[in-house]
């Protein structure tokens, strides 16, 4: 049985890519199937990363022609015409040439539409286009319609669907009437701890990286690692900073980092207009090691997002022993709530109140210690590999019926 792991994107694309990268490394470490598992990548920069790691991979380079063909295959009459003249999508030709029996998509990918008779597994991280459709990122350029079409295809044709939380599973069942046995829950496992452990012998590197930003060391630094999407709700922190400014409370500094996903200029201009430069700093893009330096040297992490339920910074904060302020009630019926500083994102004043936790060092120490132990429990790499090995075993058994 030959398996292809489809890793789409490159390191510049942020958290989703690194989540997929970590998953791909763990999949390659499943001993029983390792000789039969190959990595499929789509960007040259990703190829360079794996070359340094001496990990073999196959490059399926996405380009404008492929994107145009993908659009043509979306249109009924052009799809029928292409079929008549026996033109297949390049991705289908690629996977057939490589003789894959199964493709593992580490995130929802348009390429899954072109697998045809080749079986596939797909990860789906969230269904926020359904639950938070009011945000522009779910509506611009027909994003909602495209996602709906893709998710209907995945939920109909995928051999298995992997989601990060039980509430994601419930959403899939409710929205798309998926057989519950088809959906596997596998928690996020972040990549940053792996990168940190590889460099751990050089701890001074991280201090030097952090110090180059010349942030005031007399302030409590709270880190928000998130792309500038509207649903990430940076505005909530701006509103809280306004309250702190009115109270002349200058103890706190919020640091934003992330790529522009349409909301960067709005947030940047608001900070300038409200003269909050003393309370909020922005770094549009940080390297992996710079992000780690902020996790190590900040006093906490914040994520007032509307979308989830879970997000990578939760587990990164747990690993690096930092408290995290997180949206209240976003993660239903889960013990993880005992490890979060829950904030009411309808009330910026609530965040200001919750910041008082920094006056209780004993409570802080207990929280971060408990969170680290919880991380080891729920982000267990062996559990991840066991879950995927069960899926591969099940498919291998079925494949043996005809091959």
List the predicted regions and their residue ranges:
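Carbohydrate transferase catalytic cores enriched for Leloir-type hexosyltransferases
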Residues: 1-403
